[in-house]
Amino acid sequence: RYDKLLKEGSLMIRIFKTTDSGIRKVAVAEEGCWIALTNPTAEELSTTADQFNIDVDDLKSPLDEEERSRIQVEENYTLIILDIPTIEERKGREYFYTIPFGIIFTDKYIFTVCLVDSPVLTVFMDGRVKDFYTYKRTRFIYQMLYRNATMFLQYLKIIDKKSDEVEKKLHISQRNQELIEMLDLEKSLVYFTTSLRGNEVVLEKLMRNTSIPRYEDDEELLEDVIIENKQAIEMAKIYSDILSGTMDAFASVISNNLNIAMKFLSVITIVLTVPTIVTSALGM
């Protein structure tokens, strides 16, 4: 059934293998392959689970947007779930949030499971990563984790740039639209910070994990991943603090402007009331 799905050209299941000419897509799963599942159907999950002796619930877990980051060691495979950053366009605006991403390590293959074709993975599929080999499974995991950490940093810089642009607009016109955009960016930073801290726990456990072979040549790469992730956490915190301070400052400005407007209206009301009082008094 699995081979049939592949022959039918499933877009949800793709198999990649490193050859002398680089990364290429193959039709049959061979030892040392990378099997990528992107938003797979129930049938594809079931056939994959049966073919490779993986619990179907573990394959489904990364497809649940509420799934928490963790490492789970089973008898014949290890499941790693962490959060990755993503962008979604709604009504002409970009929204930043995170979704789960699963890596399954077996003695022959690497599986990845995700709801979308994330830039975290597409660079590997396109052969744009140096020293990437599907059969070097431990290094491949570290490379994906490193790519994920750098994507967080990249998106954080975009969020910071967007917040600067919105702030400039607020200086000119304090409209609700700009304030809502600032709130959305602040919410994105909260998502990122929470996800990065969850990923940090996974990385710490990965350092102590023995189910995935560790090689001396790859140790530095894992250390780099941890450093990049910590840097992303610090950057998210700094940007969040700055954004919160900016929001508070503009809230104070708006409140002051409102007070001034209310005082002005009170004066106008009194001025308009005086003639009425005088007229009433003379009428009496």
Which residue stretches match the model-derived regions?
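Peripheral, non-transmembrane regulatory/ligand-interaction domains of membrane transport proteins
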Residues: 2-215, 221-224, 228-235
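Hydrophobic alpha-helical transmembrane segments and their immediately adjacent juxtamembrane loops
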Residues: 53-54, 230-284
